[in-house]
Amino acid sequence: MTERRGVRGSDAVLLLAVLLTVPAAVGAQEAPALATDRVAVVPFDNISGSVDDGWLGAGIAETVTAGLSGSGVALRSVTRVLDAAAGEQLGARWVVSGSYQRLGDQLRVTARVRDESTGMVVGAVTVDGALAGFFALQDRVVAALVPVLAGLVPGGRGPDEVRAPAPEAPARAAREQRGPPARPRPATPPAAAPERAVRTAGVIDGPPPPVAPAVINRDAEGRATIRATRLTEVLTLDGQLDESVYATVPAISDFIQQMPDPGAPPTEKTDAWILFDEANLYVGARIWDSAPPSEWIANEMRRDSEQLFRNDNFWVIVDTFYDRRNAVAFFSNALGGMGDAAITNEGNPNRDWNPVWDVRTGRFEGGWTVEMEIPFRSLRYRPGPDQIWGIQLRRNLARKNEWVFVSPPPISVGGGGGIFRVSAAATLVGLEVPEGSKNLEIKPYGIGGLSTNLAATPPTRNVGDGNAGVDVKYGITQNLTADFTYNTDFAQVEVDEQQVNLTRFSLFFPEKREFFLEGAGIFDFARGAQLGSFYTALRRIGAGGGNPMGGGNAPTLFYSRQIGLQRGTVVPIVGGGRVTGKVGDFDVGFLNIHTGDEAAAGVAMTNFTVARVKRDILRRSSLGALFTNRSVSLLGDGASQAYGADATFAFFENVGVIGYLAKTDTPGRADKNLSYQGRFDYAADRYGVQAEHLVVEDHFIPEVGFLRRDNFRRTYTTGRFSPRPRSLDSIRQFRLEGSFDYIEAADTGSVETRQSQVGVSAELENSDRVGFNVVDNYEFLVRPFTPGPGVTLPVGGYRFQDVEATYSLGLQRRLTGTVTVRAGEYFNGTIRSVGFMRARLPITEQFSVEPSVSLNWIDTPLGAFRTDLVVARVNYTFTPRMFFSGLTQYNSANSTVSNNLRLRWEYSPGSELFVVYTEARETDPLMPDRSTELRNRGFVVKVNRLFRF
């Protein structure tokens, strides 16, 4: 059985509003005074209409009358009357009325408390139960009404002092497997009272809940609280929005611009609804657009693609723990493309997280519609049936470069990153989530294929192989999840996109394997919120963990690609487990994985352990600790460990402080094994400043992490001035930035890197961007460096400068991408570079081509060389759940041409079929006879099936 009750207390503000709105026509007869300690109870209405059930209404009213009289609330009289008018004649301020409905042997009773002085419903409760337990059900109605009246009557007990007994959950009918595109979903029996008040469990960071039928309430600061509506009918997920709920429940329509005109109304209307039933959260929206469909930016259906992020789209994020830091996001465009992301610490979105959910879209004369269905079992939340969540709704109108929110974040995080400012989200109340589900998921897989490896010893050709394994997910509690994997296989994962590396440091590649993606943000170390815009006029030189604005030099203490991969060779994962979630104010994560041996990579069987705990403090800050262990070190006999403690603080809208202290234990390296960092960020819209000090000692070696460079002490500062000129209609914002990076050896103190940058850029109103920067470098090579074939630079100091110009084509254009031209010095020589990166050309709504080209000509006194990187991706999306992707890459640095062809079909939510072909060829023979020599290739078919219990 479920139970819901709402409380709305009268206060001085409400009383004043009532007094001001009472009609006071001259000569009108004065209404009789209503006593605040008198209650009238009227018979409850029989919604079901069955004559046999007619006696129930009088029985409920009689029990309520008697129960309230002996409740202990300071009431002078509780009288049963025939109707509300009779109660008013008795001078009763409060009238209790209601209804009941019967479905089989189940009974639902809804009771409302109305203030006769205003006619407003100020509280409501709903109780479900079996007809056989009718007397106990009546007692629970009384127990639920007592705290409502206690909060209204002077001298009464507080509304939180009395709670009705928790009901039992009724048996739920088994859900059918997904069928055709339009799928009905079960809903609860029709509710009688659309104006049910909301009960909340917790403190709301915003205005009070809206009083039904209103669904949104704003305060003077613009903060919003939204009320979710329980469905009273079956909802068919078809994107048409033709159910009666969309006509009877008010829409959330007062969206607000964040960009380009902060605080202004949107230029196009958006209506949204937040609905739920016993199994799912539903988000529906009607997206009005005065332009014809041919002008909409809707040209991608592939799940989680970068282009989908740039289309006209509609987003919802839910902060299910209401911690104002972490959330999950779901979005779609007019074509029904699906996108989702897990947001950690107000930034760092993980768009490779793929929960089970569904979406359908439609079109109407004047716009498009979207319906999302998000199962509660795909979410993690605090225990208890009544919830307070954070919620944000956003619409992106790409052709106008316009972003509108239901609760807009500060403009300093304008553009796409604004959706990740979780603390700016509205509050969601009124949800009733299922209780008691163990939430067990079992996902077995089978795989088979052929492989050829001519680089192996001995070479192999067309070797057949097959395998099977299983992943299991178990909800320990509603907010703590255990994952187990056995015989894990990642053959379906797309290959990495190659990068040009003209530095002497390692490249960083993101994790793409599904098992390591869910809950990955919990293991992030010393990563603060995204305070400002993603965009910068400065060149992001290098890669790796840490803040990209700071150059990516901070170590990543846990880097999951160290598990199951070694020197480019796949190492088999025998099995393992992970526990992630939230316990009170603590984020917790524990990971243990066991890998097999791999002779080709020289790796023995190894066990990996990672433990993470993080404590939320203040409003948006945290303290944490991380531990990693590798049972077999790569650098000596024995195990290696890393320990770290970190703190992230966020103040006001745009101030952040981050710090950490970490230590590693590596065989044979007992000293000089510390790393620590302190960083300050101020990121307002018009100005920005960052200062950082980072130390990585010589023997600090996180063997389950990532380290771009070692043995250094770094001091880094940057400043930004970014005005928005009102006198230039074509310019949205200028950015003038400068930075200074000073790196010296941690042990000797000698200078190794000194870099100064100055950059200027402009964002145009049509979303194009143009930029120009100048870089002055000093590098001291402590060992010889070979940037290209036949060229080895000797030890010594080098000073060199270069300039770079960029132009990024905006989202409104058919062809998008960034053109880059660079010229200047390179160590003791010269460099000329040209590139066209992240380009995309849609041929149709389903077919697109994504080319990227990077060409570099380098000439030094020791010789000249050229590096070419050409990447071409072809995408064909059959439906939002089935797509083909072909990726071809030519990299002259390692003389290879590689191909990766993938077909992915999600034939049922969470269940997939993959067909993958990969190939790598030697390109040295390419020049004389236009042929290539095969290195390796593979063909696999993998199928998995998700079972949810």
State each model region's role.
Residues 10-24:
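Bacterial N-terminal signal peptides
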Residues 572, 660-949:
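Exposed, low-structure sequence patches enriched in small/polar residues
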Residues 175-178, 183-616, 622-624:
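Structural preference for beta-rich elements and adjacent junctions enriched in aromatics
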Residues 32-37, 44, 139-186:
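Mid-sequence helix-capping/hinge segment at a functional interface
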Residues 31-107, 115-132, 158-169:
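Short beta-strand->alpha-helix linker/helix-N-cap micro-motif
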Residues 1-9:
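N-terminal secretory signal peptides that target proteins for export/translocation
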Residues 381-387, 432-440, 474, 479, ...:
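Short loop/turn motifs that connect adjacent beta-strands in outer-membrane beta-barrel proteins
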